Design a protein with these regions (language model features):
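Non-catalytic accessory regions of SAM-dependent methyltransferases
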Residues: 1-138
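Non-catalytic substrate-recognition/targeting regions of SAM-dependent transferases
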Residues: 122-135, 154-230
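Conserved class I S-adenosyl-L-methionine
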Residues: 246-256
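Mobile active-site "lid"/loop adjacent to the S-adenosyl-L-methionine
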Residues: 326-356
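S-adenosyl-L-methionine
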Residues: 280-330
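C-terminal catalytic and target-recognition region of SAM-dependent MTase-like enzymes
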Residues: 325, 352, 366-428
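Conserved SAM-binding motif I beta-strand of class I
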Residues: 271-276
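Conserved SAM-binding loop of SAM-dependent methyltransferases across substrates and taxa
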Residues: 257-270
């Protein structure tokens, strides 16, 4: 017999219940047995809070329903004493911020550390707020909402974000929404972006922000940049490259706006070559180098890395013109796969770019290589790198294995929240 609960009800299969008990936060479309109104007759509406029950009547938790999505329910609590009201979300926001306080350097801010004014404040399921991403850049929050449940909660959660930070002495006064992701169509949501003009929010004159990370400055256009603006998940990995770069000639592939390359230059690299297929990204990377006074030791090339690396291996004159030979190569490609169906193709892509990089490295040289897709597991990435090493006839010594920064926490039971791997090797 089901216990009395205040919300409409979703009854799920035994398999779904096992998954929820193991900590996974999603109920999929095919796992729903039936849906029922609440005890008071309240019907289910898209994005509302629902109670989730196993067929035997056991309560599994409460979540937000997405009636247009294959992910039908995203869980928000397994505590039967929780009531999903404004106070509930206030606690979630406060917990998320306090975690950043602890994990990213205590109370030394503005931002998260003395040399940094940015961090990820909310990381969706990992912070108990499924469908919500919040990045903090100095005085501005940049948000991305990906579910209908969070879309409905914007008027509740946005003021809580500002209030939580301001009560902690943080100079945060504005929210910029980047709800222009095509993925919103899966939830039946429109795309839009712009300043949120709700309770307690200011509207700055410009969407440009000066981001400081690891003591380096980046001129960021939050209106037109990728996703929520800056890839904050690589912060400590960039610092690791800085520590390795002293006296070396560095090739930064898929450089975006230059954060890996600038960290290498700041770490005392003899020379850094940054490469990206986007001319806009290259121009921004060069501008950021000038902003930090590092441009004299850096060069910038607009090229397709998948073609550029083999060309350097074939043409030693071009290699010298580009600043080589290089003894540290950084590979930070975009996600090669966004679904299980393309993992095999992605593995081939990772194998090819790592093979091409290994061909350029001398004995004693270093390779820092990344993957940012949770479908490409750590084991699959290592297998692709091992295959590349075999093909290149080199032996690798693993120096370090890292993941995403701690402001992107990994929720155990939800492998989707572990998506970034960063591996450093030396050719021996």
């Amino acid at each position: 017999m089901k216990q009395a609960r205040p919300y409409p009800q979703v009854v799920v299969t035994r398999k779904a219940a096992r998954s929820l008990k193991a900590g996974h936060p999603w109920v999929f479309e095919g796992e729903v047995v039936r849906m029922e109104p609440a005890a008071d007759g309240t019907a289910i509406s898209n994005g509302c809070v629902v109670d989730v029950f196993e067929e035997n009547g056991t309560w599994q938790g409460a979540g937000l329903i997405s009636q247009n999505s294959k992910i039908r329910v995203r869980m928000v609590t397994r505590n039967a004493n929780d009531r999903i009201d404004e106070a509930f979300w206030a606690r979630r926001v406060a917990w998320a911020w306090q975690h950043r306080r602890v994990a990213m350097g205590g109370r030394a801010l503005p931002g998260c550390e003395p040399d940094t004014n940015c961090c990820r404040m909310v990381f969706s399921e990992a912070d108990g707020m499924p469908g919500l991403i919040v990045d903090r850049y100095e005085h501005v929050l940049v948000t991305q909402v990906g579910t209908v449940g969070m879309e409905r909660l914007r008027p509740v959660i946005y003021p809580l974000l500002l209030k939580t930070l301001q009560e902690d002495g943080q100079n945060v006064c504005a929210i910029y929404e980047r709800n222009d992701s095509p993925a919103r169509a899966k939830e039946g949501l429109p795309q839009y972006k712009g300043w949120w003009q709700g309770e307690g929010a200011e509207v700055p004159e410009t969407p440009r922000i000066m981001v400081v990370e690891n003591g380096l400055k980046f001129d960021l256009d939050i209106e037109n940049s990728q996703k929520t603006g800056f890839f904050l998940d690589q912060k400590y990995n960039r610092r690791a490259v800085r520590e390795l770069a002293g006296g070396r000639r560095v090739l930064d592939c898929f450089c975006h706006v230059g954060p890996f390359g600038l960290n290498a230059a700041a770490g005392g690299a003899e020379f850094v070559r940054c490469v990206d297929v986007s001319q806009t990204a290259i121009d921004l990377a060069a501008a950021n180098a000038r902003l930090n006074g590092l441009d004299t030791s850096m060069g910038f090339t607009c090229a397709n890395v998948l073609e550029y690396l083999p060309e350097l291996a074939r043409d030693r004159k071009r290699l010298r013109e580009e600043g080589g030979p290089f003894d540290l190569i950084v590979l930070d490609p975009p996600a090669f796969t966004k679904s299980r169906g393309t993992v095999e193709h992605a593995s081939k892509g990772y194998r090819e770019i790592n093979y091409a990089a290994m061909r350029l490295l001398p004995r004693g040289g270093y390779l820092a290589t990344c993957s940012c897709s949770h479908f490409m597991t750590t084991e699959l990435l290592k297998r692709a790198i091992a295959d590349a090493a075999h093909q290149a006839n080199v032996q690798l010594k693993q120096i370090e294995e890292r993941q995403q920064a701690p402001d992107h926490p990994i929720l155990w039971g939800a492998p989707e929240t572990h998506y970034l791997d960063f591996l450093t090797f030396q050719v021996v």
